[in-house]
Regions:
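Flexible, compositionally biased loop and terminal segments
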Residues: 1-140
Length: 140
């Protein structure tokens, strides 16, 4: 996920990433995304530019219509985002896909993030009452 056509990306790196995409294009068991040269604002700006140049009347554009112009339109919304290194910000990371995400913050640095940390984050996520923008349901 990102702008591989950016001239600042070394050609050998670009070729290797595209080869990896081709080699894994028909895999169906796991979805795995690498954010490389990715910026959320750049993705949204690109999507808006493509939508405006497209056949759809932008005043009638739905979320599903707009999604078609994102880098990975088939990528589902992110349910859980684990932010390592104690940073509590998105840092321009997938603004469209994280609109209703749950966040878990950890002081653990990414290179030190192990399976136990992952399971702990998932366990915390499982305690959440997800509303996806809706009001909290009060129990009577």
């Amino acid at each position: 996920v990102g702008d591989l056509d950016d001239p600042r990306v070394p050609p050998a790196c670009r070729d290797w990433l595209r080869e990896c995409e081709t080699m894994t294009a028909h895999n169906t068991e796991l979805e795995f995304a690498i954010a490389f040269n990715y910026g959320g604002r750049a993705e949204l700006l690109r999507a808006m530019t493509l939508a405006a140049a497209g056949e759809t009347d932008v005043s009638q554009l739905s979320e599903n219509d707009f999604r078609k112009y994102l880098y990975c339109p088939e990528m589902p919304d992110i349910d859980l985002l684990v932010r390592t290194s104690s940073e509590q910000r998105l840092s321009n990371y997938f603004p469209w896909h994280t609109a209703y995400s749950e966040f878990v913050y950890t002081d653990t640095l990414w290179p030190d993030f192990l399976g136990a940390h992952f399971y702990s984050a998932v366990a915390e996520y499982q305690t959440r009452k997800r509303r996806k923008g809706g009001k909290a349901v009060t129990e009577s």
